[in-house]
């Protein structure tokens, strides 16, 4: 399978992607990681309004193969939760970067997206040459 690695995304070591938009961070899980999980059957996300610290779990993704936790790459308040993914887990599998985003985070402090991997760096980590 060939994966998409859009240039406007940055990635955490734990496969979450971050898209910075107007001071907010849209967070989801990379196509690569979702493909590794297989068929997604259940998604649970933290509540809107939750304040969490960097590295804390903000959700769980359950597939036929495994149950994986997803982690916040930055501290802040979850200002939006993608309920469509909770109601329709296949959205996460079919379009993880588009309709399958998970949460929108309002960072607690100014964040440095450059602390995360660029798309190119992430791609070289997960796709053998």
Curated annotation (Swiss-Prot):
PTM-bearing positions, type N6-lipoyllysine: 65
UniProt remark on cofactor binding: Binds 1 lipoyl cofactor covalently.
Family annotation (HAMAP family): GcvH
Oligomer status and interactors: The glycine cleavage system is composed of four proteins: P, T, L and H.
NCBIfam families, per the entry: gcvH, PRK01202.1
Any Gene Ontology biological process: glycine decarboxylation via glycine cleavage system
Family designation: Belongs to the GcvH family.
Any Pfam family matching the protein: GCV_H
Role noted for this protein: The glycine cleavage system catalyzes the degradation of glycine. The H protein shuttles the methylamine group of glycine from the P protein to the T protein.
Protein name: Glycine cleavage system H protein
Superkingdom of this protein's organism: Bacteria
Keywords: Lipoyl
Cofactor(s) demanded: (R)-lipoate
UniProt entry tagged with the keyword Metal-binding: no
Lineage: Bacteria, Bacillati, Cyanobacteriota, Cyanophyceae, Synechococcales
All copies of domain Lipoyl-binding, residue ranges: 24-106
Residues in coiled coil: none
């Amino acid at each position: 399978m060939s994966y998409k690695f859009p240039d406007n995304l940055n990635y955490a070591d734990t496969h979450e992607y971050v898209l910075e938009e107007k001071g907010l961070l849209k967070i989801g899980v990379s196509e690569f990681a979702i493909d590794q999980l297989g068929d997604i059957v259940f998604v649970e996300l933290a509540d809107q309004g939750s304040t969490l610290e960097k590295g804390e779990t903000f959700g769980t993704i359950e597939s036929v193969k495994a149950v994986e936790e997803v982690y916040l790459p930055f501290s802040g308040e979850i200002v939006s939760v993608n309920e469509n993914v909770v109601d329709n887990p296949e959205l996460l599998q079919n379009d993880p970067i588009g309709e399958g985003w998970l949460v929108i985070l309002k960072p607690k402090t100014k964040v440095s997206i450059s602390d995360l991997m660029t798309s190119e760096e992430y791609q070289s980590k997960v796709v053998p040459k």
